[in-house]
């Protein structure tokens, strides 16, 4: 535990935001942009992604020669602030739209939701259809999934607890995986 805290403190000095920090409701939200083009692809992370900017990099780097790319790191993700506020879908959507606006990224968008953000993308398209040109799902969740979803909360909390203690540092299979080494799983 002590080693983890020392390493974490040293690592914090190495971290610099990869995107622009914009103010949303009094807190900083990270928005990364890259590329040019007539269409803007907005990558939307699911739950449990530490850094959406890095998580999507192997994909958006292949697209940024032809399209504008935007990655919004929701509160609690990446370089965005951690907030103790309601995380309902209306709040999250409002914050995402505000962050894009403050970063100067105008609709219409091609939404690229991963996992749980699929619901946010569908809701966005229903509520603001003029802002959504298309949705390209990246293994996205759909409403029917929630009827059958069975999240093992104790296992999830155990994982969070182990990460907080630094136990994941002792798992070389995670730190030395191909995805971590190269940023992608395949050529």
Q: What residues fall within each predicted segment?
A:
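Active-site loop/oxyanion-hole signature of alpha/beta-hydrolase fold enzymes
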Residues: 74-112
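Alpha/beta-hydrolase fold catalytic core
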Residues: 1-41, 64-67, 101, 106
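Gram-positive cell-envelope targeting signals
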Residues: 1-6, 73, 111, 139
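Conserved HGGG/HGGXW glycine-rich cap/lid loop of the alpha/beta-hydrolase fold
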Residues: 27-79
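Flexible "cap/lid" subdomain of the alpha/beta-hydrolase fold that forms the substrate-access gate
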Residues: 89, 131-187
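Conserved hydrolase catalytic core segment
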Residues: 106-150
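Conserved catalytic-core motifs of eukaryotic protein kinase domains, centered on the activation segment
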Residues: 53-55, 80-86, 147-148
């Amino acid at each position: 535990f002590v080693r983890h805290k020392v390493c974490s403190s040293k690592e914090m000095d190495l971290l610099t935001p990869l995107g622009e920090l914009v103010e949303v409701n009094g807190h900083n939200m990270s928005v990364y942009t890259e590329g040019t083009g007539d269409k803007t692809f907005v990558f939307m992370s699911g739950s449990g992604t530490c850094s959406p900017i890095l998580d999507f990099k192997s994909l958006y780097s292949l697209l940024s020669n032809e399209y504008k790319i935007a990655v919004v790191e929701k509160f609690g993700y990446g370089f965005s602030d951690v907030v103790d506020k309601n995380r309902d879908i209306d709040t999250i959507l409002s914050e995402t739209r505000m962050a894009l606006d403050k970063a100067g990224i105008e609709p219409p968008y091609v939404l690229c939701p991963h996992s749980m953000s699929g619901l946010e993308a569908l809701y966005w398209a229903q509520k603001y259809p003029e802002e959504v040109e298309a949705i390209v799902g990246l293994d996205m969740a759909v409403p029917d999934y929630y009827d059958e979803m069975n999240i093992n909360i104790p296992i999830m909390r155990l994982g969070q607890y182990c990460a907080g203690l630094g136990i994941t540092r002792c798992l070389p299979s995670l730190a030395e995986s191909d995805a971590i080494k190269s940023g992608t799983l395949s050529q």
